[in-house]
Amino acid sequence: MLWRLVQQWSVAVFLLSYSVPSCGRSVEELGRRLKRAVSEHQLLHDKGKSIQDLRRRFFLHHLIAEIHTAEIRATSEVSPNSKPAPNTKNHPVRFGSDDEGKYLTQETNKVETYKEQPLKTPGKKKKSKPGKRKEQEKKKRRTRSAWLTSYVAGTGLEEDYLSDISATSLELNSRRH
C-alpha cells in the first residue's frame, strides 16, 4: 500500500514539474502571459474604458434619437378637465398703458449722446516735506482744544485763538491757490 502511494505521488510531482504544452503553448508561456508590465495593464485599462465610453455614447445617441423622432401629440385631443400647457396660455400683448415707459426712474431714452470727459494728462506730483502735514495737524488740534478750554473756562482768551485760527486758515488758503 505504501508502495502504491509513493508511485501516485511521484506521478503527480512529475506532471506538475514537467511543462506540458497546452493548446500549442508550453506552461511557461502561459505563466509569462499572466505577468504583464504596468504599461500593458494601463493600455488594457484605457482600452476597456474607451470601449465602455463608446457603448455609453451609442446608448445615449439611441435614446436621443428616440426622443427627437417621437411623435408630436395633437393639442386638439385634450380632455375637458386637464389644465392647458403653460406655453399655450393666452396672455395680452401689452400689460400697461402706453405712457408707462415714459416715466421711468432712470432715463433710458435719452436723445443726447454720451460725451466723453477729456482725460487728465499726468503731471508732476507736488513733493511735500515729510513733517509739514504733522505740523498742520498739530495746529488744528491746538485751536480745537483752545476753543473747548476757552468756552468751558470762560477766560478772555477767545480773541487770541481767533486770530491764531484766522492766520492758519489764511496760510492754508494761500498754499492752495
From Swiss-Prot:
**What residue spans carry the Basic and acidic residues bias annotation?**
109-118
Q: Which domain of life is it from?
A: Eukaryota
Q: Which UniProt keywords apply?
A: Calcium, Cleavage on pair of basic residues, Cytoplasm, Hormone, Nucleus, Secreted, Signal
Query: From the record, which residues define motif Nuclear localization signal?
Result: 108-129
Residue ranges, annotated region (Disordered): 74-149
- Where is the protein situated, by its record's location annotation? Secreted; Cytoplasm; Nucleus
**For this UniProt entry, which residues form the secretion signal?**
1-24
Q: How is it modified after translation?
A: There are several secretory forms, including osteostatin, arising from endoproteolytic cleavage of the initial translation product. Each of these secretory forms is believed to have one or more of its own receptors that mediates the normal paracrine, autocrine and endocrine actions.
Q: Which GO terms describe its cellular component?
A: cytoplasm; extracellular region; nucleus
Basic residues composition-biased segments: 122-132
Please report a single Pfam family linked to this protein: Parathyroid
Q: Where is the composition biased (Polar residues)?
A: 76-90
Listed name of the protein:
Parathyroid hormone-related protein
Q: What is the lineage of its organism?
A: Eukaryota, Metazoa, Chordata, Craniata, Vertebrata
